Amino acid sequence: MKSHEYIVICGLNRSKVGRYIAIVASFLSFISIFLALTALEWLKNYHINSHIPASVFSLISAGGIYMGLYAWFDKNLWQNSYLGKFLCVPNLEGRWHVDGHTRSEGGNTWEGELKIVQTWDKVRIHLKTKASHSDSVTASIIYDKGIGYQLLYNYRNQPKTGEEHLTSHVGFAEFRFDADLKSAEGHYFNGQGRATYGTMTITRIEHA
């Protein structure tokens, strides 16, 4: 399963982020081209004939700079803690230890590891236990100023070979994170193959 887009509810509008990056790209493009042309004029004073290839101007065009800035923002820049607070998007990327409690079928406890791979545009949530593994299909993050961040996602679960008592199924999970983003509590519901439900507590092991 590959990473997929996710929705941010009550965070900074994503289209505004694109516009802000476009404004910065336009400004940097203007400065870059101005400096390049100034350098050419300066070289002429020393009777040095030079020219800048069209390919260079294409790289320092607003479009070229925008692509570079957006790639940097998507992979790394958005994870800055101060910028993250402004964007209202938490950095959940990393490995999390899972303590689960099935509340149906007689009830039982289980453990697993949740791995979240996250960029500004996409996310992948993978849960691995001794009996099965699941991957997110859709996801959304909700920001509530009075409560904090919530993560909601749908997933598809696949039992490991030899687990005959388990069947493939889809489900839904929801987590509410502490203010320090080091732990969260939540619950899950399964259906279309396995009608079970329960609770989960996750604790961050490490950042990616």
UniProtKB/Swiss-Prot annotation:
Principal location listed in the UniProt entry: membrane
Protein name: CD-NTase-associated protein 15
Keyword rRNA-binding recorded: no
GO cellular component, one term: plasma membrane
Record text on subunit structure and interactions: The beta barrel domain oligomerizes; in the presence of c-di-UMP or c-di-UAMP higher-level oligomers are detected.
Record remark: domains: Cell toxicity relies on the transmembrane domain; its replacement by a SUMO domain prevents cell death in cells also expressing DncV from V.cholerae. The C-terminus (residues 78-208) forms a minimal, eight-stranded beta barrel. Trp-96 stacks against Arg-204 and forms a hydrogen bond with Leu-92 to close the barrel. A set of conserved residues in the 'top' of the barrel (Thr-129; Tyr-153; Tyr-155; Asn-157; Tyr-188 and Met-200) surround a probable cyclic dinucleotide-binding site; when mutated these residues decrease or abolish nucleotide binding and impact protection against phage in vivo.
Pfam families, sorted: Cap15_CD_rec
A GO biological process held by the record: defense response to virus
Gene Ontology molecular functions: nucleotide binding
Family: Belongs to the CBASS Cap15 membrane effector family.
Ranges annotated as spanning the membrane: 20-40, 52-72
